[in-house]
Regions:
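Juxtacatalytic substrate-recognition/specificity segment
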Residues: 27-152, 159-169, 211-226, 262-276
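Beta/coil-rich, acidic/histidine-enriched accessory regions frequently appended to metallopeptidases
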Residues: 31-34, 227-230, 262-421, 428, ...
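Post-HExxH zinc-binding segment in Zn-dependent metallohydrolases
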Residues: 89, 143-211, 280-285
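Canonical positions in the second alpha-helix
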Residues: 363, 388, 421-422, 463-464, ...
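Structural marker of alpha-solenoid helical repeat scaffolds
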Residues: 366, 391, 425, 467, ...
């Protein structure tokens, strides 16, 4: 028997060093990274390569979805952050619970009015596919007018089947099909799938009539869905399969116009839109379904013991963009910020909220000792600020998220204190300006008061929109502020921008109706309120019915729905956030004089030729307009806030243009611009 030889003493230091190095490498977690692609932010601890792959896959899925809707551009009015975790332990510690257990899928979506989040478990392959259904709903909500449940769910299920790599997109398979059997640890076969796939539902003899399918109510606004293993989901999926691949989306738009705007009965609308009866339409979809042999081949394979479910797709085509088409930036993210982000996501999941709050409070209290920001009331914090920014301790993101949570629960004093602490730690965080504006609005709502610090609120919201131009909620809040400030035309411009960015948001539509009421445009307000009174949101429906009842009194007695706006609301006050966007502060100061009280001068209309534009005192501008033998000079305090029609943005280079203007006279041959139309 061979004897083990002793290790020479001279080798021990080298071996010990190697062990220490290995231990150190194992113990050190990969750094957190923050990656930015064209449309998404990815936060990951899985390394830059994985982070780039996640960003690429979501950009690819976004591009494929745009092609399905035949759109050149998709809007994203709520910022989306993707948290991609390398291990399943932290993933399951924050995942939503179902019957007391974390969900089994490797990805989930957390929606919000201010931010959306996606969380992925990168320990699983292609984890992004787990959120494809919700991702489709999100993009659909922002980029397609209100539709019916079969359309939304059918398109989301179709998109859920997507597979994408660096070269090819594959789509169209049964998204609910899985293997019927699996092997346990002892290689014994056990039954795995008990629910029917969509293909199996459609293979039966009974289908819903198209009229019944198209009239079934199904709320998709909350992202809260039950099982997808139903005939409704199966038939909706196949109808959209047919419409997309037979290029019938334009006819579908016609159908929705007939049903939702012209109130044509469903069967008649099907006939007019698709050129066939409801029965013929149903048969066309059935024939299309039976022609998709790949679905039946995959179903047969899934029923065979020892054979994995087939991933064969119905359609394949080249990727719309690949790794070489992407510009993705990357930078380290402090560990405390990453932990605060994870805690924020927990706070937004009801069953995880208490754990998330404890983590945020610990992060907010951590760090070197410092003087806390002075505690004041919510009204004091919302309407005025100290000339010097107070100091605070802890993590800025944690303070900001705690402020958001306090706002959601009506704890306004606490929210104001947390925002003050966050601003003391990082006055350049634009999110603070947004949440400060939201806080002012919520205080006014809850106490039935006017919004305090209105001029600063509008200044802050303009800074937010400069940072993220597609932020619909900032446009909406700006519309509300301008309405209260006595500028209904500018308010209408902001609210319409919000609705264009998020066409299914009924709260924005309600605010637009309120702007119409303020301007006594009764018919326009009635049209919107009549639509809203049938809303699935009971609070919005009740408000719409109440306002419809008020319109008669408004018309009869001439009562204004927005009277007595205090001039003091528009007095500019010093804010700790001025340093964020100095030019916005200057524009707000320039406007203060004109916005200091309700302008009772009558509006006048003029058509003529734009001779010259003087921007020497930017952002103010003076336009010289000739109309016949008359020449007038019309001024705007901020051309970036001027209501424009017929042009995307104001230009100081305009010359010799036909224009129409609304203005308020300010002396002989002079006035203040209200709106400008380029003809």
């Amino acid at each position: 028997m061979a004897r083990a030889r002793p290790i020479p003493i001279s080798f021990l230091p080298a071996m010990l060093l190697g062990v220490l190095l290995c231990t150190s490498a194992t113990a050190t977690e990969p750094p957190w990274l923050e990656l930015h692609s064209t449309h998404f932010t990815v936060i990951t601890d899985a390394g830059e390569k994985k982070g780039r792959e996640v960003a690429l896959r979501f950009e690819q899925m976004r591009a494929v979805f745009a092609s399905l809707l035949a759109k050149d551009r998709l809007r994203l009015p709520v910022p989306l952050t993707i948290l991609a975790l390398k291990n399943d332990k932290p993933f399951y510690q924050m995942a939503p619970l179902r019957q007391g257990q974390p969900i089994s899928v490797p990805g989930f979506f957390v929606p919000g009015d201010d931010q959306n989040f996606i969380v992925l478990n990168l320990f699983e392959e292609e984890s992004w596919r787990a959120v494809a259904h919700d991702f489709a709903h999100m993009l659909l909500n922002y980029n397609y007018p209100p539709a019916q449940g079969w359309f939304d769910e059918g398109l989301a299920e179709y998109f859920r089947s997507i597979r994408v790599d660096n070269k090819q997109v594959a789509i169209g398979s049964d998204p609910e099909l899985g293997a019927s059997f699996s092997d346990d640890l002892l290689q014994n076969q056990r039954e795995l799938r008990t629910s029917k796939s969509l293909t199996e539902f459609l293979g039966g003899q009974v289908w819903l009539s198209m009229a019944d399918l198209f009239t079934m109510r199904h709320d998709t606004s909350t992202y809260q869905e039950g099982t997808h293993h139903t005939l409704f989901y199966a038939q909706s999926w196949m109808v959209m399969h047919y419409l997309l691949n037979q290029k019938k989306l334009p006819e579908t738009g016609t159908y929705f116009d007939l049903v939702q705007n012209q109130h044509v009965p469903v069967e008649e609308a099907i006939s007019k839109a698709y050129g066939m009866s409801s029965a013929q339409f149903e048969q066309a979809v059935k024939d299309y379904f039976h022609s998709l042999r790949a679905l039946f081949t995959a179903l047969d394979a899934s029923k065979q013991p020892g054979v994995a479910a087939s991933a064969a797709q119905v359609y394949q085509f080249p990727v719309p963009l690949g790794p070489d088409d992407m510009v993705i930036s990357s930078k380290p993210l402090p560990d405390a910020d990453a932990r605060a982000l994870a805690a924020e996501i927990k706070v937004r999941i009801p069953e995880r909220r208490e754990v998330g709050l404890k983590e945020l409070q610990a992060l907010a209290a951590a760090g070197p000792e410092s003087h806390a920001a002075p505690k004041r009331s919510a009204e004091e914090n919302a309407s005025e600020s100290n000339s010097a920014i107070a100091t605070a301790t802890g993590n800025e993101l944690a303070h900001r998220v705690l402020a958001w949570d306090h706002i959601q629960h009506g704890e306004f004093d606490e929210a104001a204190e947390e925002l003050g602490n966050a601003a003391a730690l990082n006055q350049h965080d634009v999110w603070i300006r947004y949440y400060l504006s939201l806080l002012k609005y919520r205080i006014a709502q809850s106490k039935h008061l006017e919004i305090q610090g209105l001029a600063n609120m509008m200044q802050d919201l303009r800074a937010v929109l400069d940072w993220y131009p597609e932020f619909a909620d900032a446009d909406d809040l700006l519309g509300v502020a301008r309405t209260e400030g006595g500028s209904p035309v500018a308010a209408m411009q902001a609210e319409r921008a919000a609705i264009q960015l998020s066409p299914r948001n009924e709260q924005y539509v309600l605010h637009l109706a309120e702007i119409y009421l303020t301007g006594k445009n009764w018919e326009a307000a009635k049209a919107l309120l009549e639509r809203l009174k049938a809303s699935g949101n009971t609070q919005i429906a009740a408000t719409a019915r109440e306002k419809l009842g008020q319109i008669g009194n408004e018309q009869k007695y001439g009562m204004s729905s927005a009277t007595g706006t205090a001039a003091g609301n528009l007095t500019t006050q010093k804010s700790p956030f001025d340093a964020l966007v100095q030019d916005a502060a200057e524009r707000a100061a320039a406007q203060t004089k004109s916005e200091a009280g309700p302008d009772k001068r009558p509006s006048q209309y003029l058509k003529g030729n734009l001779v010259a534009v003087d921007c020497s005192q930017s952002p103010a501008a003076t336009l010289t307009i000739a109309s016949g033998a008359r020449t007038v000079k019309l001024r705007t305090g901020d051309f970036k806030s001027l209501l424009l029609i017929g042009a995307d943005q104001f230009s100081c280079e305009w010359r010799d243009r036909s224009v129409s203007v609304n203005y308020k006279a300010a002396g002989r041959g002079a006035g203040d611009l209200v709106s400008l139309e380029i003809r």
